[in-house]
Structures are given as C-alpha cells and as structure tokens.
Amino acid sequence: LTVAQPGRRRPTEVLPLPPDDTIRDLAARLSPRIRLGASTWSYPGWAGIVWDEGPYSEAVLARNGLSAYAQHPLLRCVGIDRSFYRPLTEGQYARYAGQVPDDFRFVVKAPALVTDALVRGEQGQGRQPNTAFLDPVLATQEFIAPALAGLGDKVGALVFQLSPLPFAQLQRLPLLLERLRALLRALPDVRGATPDGVVAVEVRDPAWLSPVIAPQLAAVLKETGATYCLGLHA
C-alpha cells in the first residue's frame, strides 16, 4: 500500500515555471496583435523554461501540459496537430479551450481527410486517390463546425494544409484552384463568428508558388477572405 505524501506533486501533474520580471516585461511590451506560440505543448525540452524541472515525459505533457504552457506570458497561442490525423469532436475541442485563458488562441489543422489528395498508409505512402479531397461538406462537418463550437472565441487560425500532390494533380493546378475556391466559399463565416478567427491555406508543393499559379492562388484567397499560411515546406 502506497500512501501519497502531503505536498508532493502527483506524477502526472505539470506545474508552470513562474516567469521572472524580464519575461513579464517583454510580454507587456509586445503588441496584443502579436501572438507567439509553438506547434505543440508536449516538448520535454522546455523543462526549466515553460514548466518546472519535472522531468515530464512527452505523453504526460500531451495529456496535462496545456494549462502550464498557457500560463507562460509569451505563449498566447498553440497549434493542434492531432486534428490532421483524425477529426476531433466538439467535446475534445472544448476540453482544450477549458484549459487556457480567455485571451489564448488555437491554430488548428484541418484533417487530412479533406486536405490530402491521397489516402496514405502508416508510412505515408500514397495508396489510392482520396475522393473526399477538398470536399466542402466534410470540411464543414468534420472540422469547421466542431472547432467553432468547441473552441468558441479561442479559435485562432483554422488551417487547410494541402499535402504534397501526386504528379498528375500538379499538372492540373488551375482545376484544383477552382475546387479550393468552391471549398472556401462554402465554409461558415469564421471571421464573423469569432474575435480573431481566420481560415488559412498552407501549400506543400513549390508549384503553387510559381509565377503563373501564385497570383491565381492569391486571388482565390482574397476573394474568399482566407489567409495564406507561410510555411517552410513549399
């Protein structure tokens, strides 16, 4: 029989590192329109920076580290990547929202279900064409609607990360642009529903940024009110 000792932290509890005055002063000088954050809150290497020395495993941080992360004065947003691999429910989003302050925002990836032209195996290899690629109905039902309902005013950017395309699709980018236009037009009004929310598009093929296609992509985003997500992979 093991009896917990008073005052000792539970093994799964993640405690924030109290920020010093330098960090607080720096955060106070930042424009409220600038939000710094990371793509995850589960990095063990932040011990002694974001949370106390721990040590904490990645699994413990993934489950219990969000609240501690959100208490750091400089970290006012974070990414949710797991939504890319499987759609999340309204309840799952709501649980995230309940762990952070009102002024915190989430950057959420749309599921590969609607952003990848291929159905992929466990190692990332393409197996077959994805018939749900850029499907506006599924994008709304499986992503936009539950994210808005669960995160509420804490929605930051809802990102459609377009995965690398097969060669045949790369030869038909003008047609894909029209499908992207139709998708973005059909989505609920994220800007109107939230204080800071935007729909964003990230591309993973350099061909999207060619002299011919890039102006067309920019026109689609401008017309539909979407934002370009600058990434390092195109």
Task: Tell what function each PLM region has.
Residues 1-234:
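Residues lining hydrophobic/aromatic ligand-binding pockets adjacent to catalytic sites
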